[in-house]
């Protein structure tokens, strides 16, 4: 059975043409992207590395890592987001190898091929997150690093990530997230360890509605990122 939620794919296909509009529904992704890339580079210098971006969408993170000197392969199952990513690539001149593939299929084709794997804002949109994590472990070289981000599952996350972000502040379209698919850090950590990934750093991402700024910190109650590596 394919680890793809076709309703999730359709949701992002419908919005794909606005992916690179910094005032669109994707404004939060544009605003947090520098924080994400800088945090990744605190752990691994991207220049000269072979990097895989899983669930790349329109390529916001993919292009940013390529601009840091990485050789980036980026995969997604949405045709429209990939078309937007390739079009923007023509305009920006940033080289990224975009492919339509599941991470599981690519893992069978290219095991141990990448120095770094990123899987950000993707796990909460698939039926079987553990399968994605296992495939990421397969794709990264021994000693290589894998980065994940997702949303915690608790009442605070429901209030802020869904009621606040989607209904009150309207930072995201209604229906972007399903609370039942949110993932506690303990669950993500258990899946990583079961796949052979060692847990490193974990950092929270918070939004201040008064200043309209995002920042990284120790609060992992809602959005968080985790650094792991494949043990040699």
Curated annotation (Swiss-Prot):
Q: Which SUPFAM superfamilies match?
A: S-adenosyl-L-methionine-dependent methyltransferases (SSF53335)
- Record Gene3D superfamilies: Vaccinia Virus protein VP39
Top-level EC class, please? transferase
Entries under InterPro entries matching the protein: SAM-dependent_MTases_sf, UbiG_MeTrfase
The UniProt keyword set, sorted, is: Methyltransferase, S-adenosyl-L-methionine, Transferase, Ubiquinone biosynthesis
Family membership noted in the UniProt record: Belongs to the methyltransferase superfamily. UbiG/COQ3 family.
Its function, per the record, reads: O-methyltransferase that catalyzes the 2 O-methylation steps in the ubiquinone biosynthetic pathway.
Read off the PANTHER family from this record. METHYLTRANSFERASE, UBIQUINONE BIOSYNTHESIS O-METHYLTRANSFERASE, MITOCHONDRIAL
Q: What is this protein called?
A: Ubiquinone biosynthesis O-methyltransferase
